[in-house]
C-alpha cells in the first residue's frame, strides 16, 4: 500500500546474464539485456542492470514508436541484517501518434475507409517522452519477528508532442483538421517508512504493519492549438493525401 509500489528486478548476488531478442508483425524489433552480479567477492556490494529497446510500426500508415529503458540497481549489504538499495530508471519514447481515430460520414465500420487509414500526418514532429525515476530503500531486520523498511523516491517527467484533431466532416469524407501542441512536466517526491512484524496473545497470531507515507506531486501542462485549420486541402478519409 501507500503512494507507490515499484517492482524492479533486484540483485541476487549470483553472477548471470541474459540477452533476449524478439521480432513480430509491423516491423517490431525488441531487444533486452539483463546482467546480475557482484562487485565485491563478499557479496556486500551487488548489482543488477537491465537495458531494453524497442522499435516498431503500426497497422496504420506512417505511425511508429521507439522506446528505450535503462534500469541499474545497486545494493549494499551492510551486514546480515541491514541493506541499502539504490535504483534508477530511465524511460525514453518517441512516437508519431499516441492513438488513431477514424471518422465516417456514413456509418460505423465504413468499408470505404482503409484499415490502415492514419488520422495524423507523417509531416508532424514526433512526440518525445523522457521519464527519470530514482529510488532509495533501507531495510533492517530488528529481530526474528520484526522488520523496519524505509524508502524514498523522486520522479521527473517531460513530454512534448503535437497532434491533429477533427474540425468537422463533409458528406464527401473531407475533414479539415486543426493542429495542437502539448508541453508537460511533472515532478513527484515520495517517502515511506514502516514496521512489519507479528506478535502472539495465547494461540492467536497478530500480523502488524504500521507506517507513514508522504507525497508531494507537481504537474505543469501547456496545451494550445497553433493552427485553427491546417493549410492545404482537407484530408479525405476515402482518398487521403498527406503533407
Regions found by a protein language model. Name each.
Residues 1-70, 78-82:
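Outer-membrane beta-barrel translocator/receptor signature
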Residues 9-34, 203, 212-243:
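Outer-membrane beta-barrel transmembrane domain signature of Gram-negative proteins
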Residues 19-23, 33, 49-55, 72, ...:
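Transmembrane beta-barrel strands of outer-membrane/channel proteins
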Residues 33-37, 72-76, 136-140, 191-197:
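Residues on the lipid-exposed face of transmembrane beta-strands in outer-membrane beta-barrel proteins
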Residues 40-42, 77-81, 143-145, 196, ...:
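Outer-membrane beta-barrel channels and translocator barrels
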Residues 54, 58, 71-141, 147, ...:
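Acidic/polar loop-and-plug regions of large Gram-negative outer-membrane beta-barrel proteins
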Residues 80-96, 198-231:
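Internal hydrophobic scaffold segments of catalytic domains
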Residues 105-114, 182-188, 192-194, 198, ...:
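Solvent-exposed loop/turn elements at secondary-structure boundaries
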Amino acid at each position: 500500500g501507500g503512494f507507490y509500489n515499484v517492482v524492479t528486478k533486484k540483485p541476487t548476488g549470483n553472477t548471470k546474464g541474459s540477452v533476449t531478442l524478439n521480432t513480430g508483425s509491423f516491423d517490431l524489433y525488441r531487444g533486452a539485456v539483463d546482467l546480475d552480479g557482484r562487485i565485491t567477492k563478499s557479496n556486500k556490494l551487488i548489482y543488477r542492470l537491465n537495458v531494453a529497446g524497442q522499435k516498431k510500426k503500426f497497422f496504420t500508415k506512417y505511425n511508429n514508436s521507439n522506446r528505450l529503458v535503462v534500469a541499474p540497481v545497486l545494493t549494499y549489504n551492510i551486514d546480515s541484517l541491514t541493506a541499502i538499495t539504490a535504483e534508477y530508471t530511465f524511460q525514453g519514447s518517441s512516437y508519431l501518434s499516441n492513438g488513431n481515430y477514424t471518422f465516417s460520414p456514413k456509418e460505423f465500420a465504413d468499408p470505404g475507409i482503409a484499415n490502415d487509414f492514419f488520422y495524423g500526418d507523417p509531416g508532424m514532429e514526433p512526440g518525445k517522452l523522457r521519464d527519470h525515476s530514482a529510488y532509495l530503500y533501507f531495510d533492517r531486520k530488528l529481530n526474528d519477528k520484526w522488520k523496519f523498511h524505509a524508502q524514498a523516491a523522486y520522479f521527473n517527467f517531460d513530454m512534448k508532442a503535437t497532434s491533429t484533431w477533427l474540425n468537422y466532416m463533409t458528406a464527401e469524407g473531407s475533414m479539415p483538421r486543426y493542429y495542437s501542441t502539448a508541453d508537460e512536466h511533472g515532478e513527484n517526491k515520495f517517502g515511506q517508512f514502516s514496521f512489519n512484524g507479528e506478535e502472539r496473545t495465547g494461540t492467536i497470531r497478530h500480523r502488524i504493519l504500521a507506517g507513514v507515507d508522504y507525497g508531494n506531486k507537481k504537474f505543469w501542462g501547456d496545451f494550445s492549438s497553433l493552427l485553427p485549420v491546417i493549410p492545404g486541402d482537407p484530408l479525405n478519409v476515402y482518398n487521403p493525401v498527406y503533407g
